[in-house]
Amino acid sequence: MSAVLTHVQLPDELPAARRILKHPRLMQSHRLTLLVVLTNAVLLGVGIGNGWWGSVVNVALIAQINFALGILIRQQFFVNALCTLVMRVPKSWPLKIRWTLAKGYHLGGLHVGGAICGTLWFWALTVIAIGQVDAGLQVTYCLQSLLLFAIVMTSRPKFRTEHHDLFERMHRFGGWALSALFWISAIQLGSASTIVVLTITTVSSLLPWTLLRRIPVDVIRPSSHVALVSSNRYRPMAGSTRSIARHPFKQWHSFAVIPTPGAPGFRMAISRAGDWTSYFIDNPPSHIWVRGIATAGMANYGSVFNRVVYVVTGSGIGPVLAHILANRVPMQLVWVTRNPVKTYGQALVDEIMRAQPDAIIWDTDADGKPDMVKLAYSAYESSNAEAVICVSNRKLTWTVVHGMEKLGIPALGPIWDS
């Protein structure tokens, strides 16, 4: 199979001026983060010019608005509503417009921007408040600043990857403690506007926890690398993800959920990729915890295109299988994995082939690792597709997405923005 790619010739890249905007460092989520930062910088300039910069009430309100932006943009019901709206866009619209709308999942950049600016405003508030508020409120602001510093330090990408459990505990329990301190300081300050904003963000944050449930599951292990989880509860929308946990106050992890054809419930594939997943596979539970609702995934935005190519590696087949079975958009599947039958089981491979008889399954044990950009382009060209959707690890996803977009081909892929 490798010999096929030697004849694939990639077209010329876009001119440098257009190509630079396709670089991963300038992806839409990063641009949105920058937009929030610049907007706050302008607001700061206006505040200094008009003399309200030193007002504790004003700065506290701006800080809370930034945090509200960061929280609401990730609210599950908002995410699903936005995705549903984009999915209804007529496919007759110009490709450039649909390509832009398909990047709707990059709105997570607003979450990052709101969190960054909200933190900076609160740190500034702690300094500004000196001499303007009583000792009790000043102590509350200092505690907020210290807690924000701890959350920021544990949220750094490298730390988050190496110490995920600590990051998650700090983000959750630190966030709850911070919310309590926000309420204490807002009541002490007596600002009605700040209390209104805080009420909205608190309700948004608590809503998923009101839907906390413990549900029974069946777990099958076709190999030591993967566990296939199924449940007959809560049939989700195709292409969505669901947060699960073995204990409600410990680690939560999100996985793509696959509706079971002709039956209630869902399935998910969990591959060995760390301590939590390894323990899950080696010690499968009889029940898991779920909270909130299943949330629309990145690949749902591919519904705006007339035909797509899915380029998938390994257990990335999980989130893509839901779209294969839903069959909302004509597609070509390219699945690159080691010995698919041995790793994922004959039943899953047969299910994929029934739904996608022309699927390209590249066995890396037999054929080695392919040039993913050439493989993606070959499938894109031969299938007359409009876009490529890649579901893989971070490095490979960005390689394929960037490789396609610098050729002028629409491409989507996870962005790991938080």
PLM features per residue range, with description:
Residues 1-418:
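FNR-like FAD-binding dehydrogenase module
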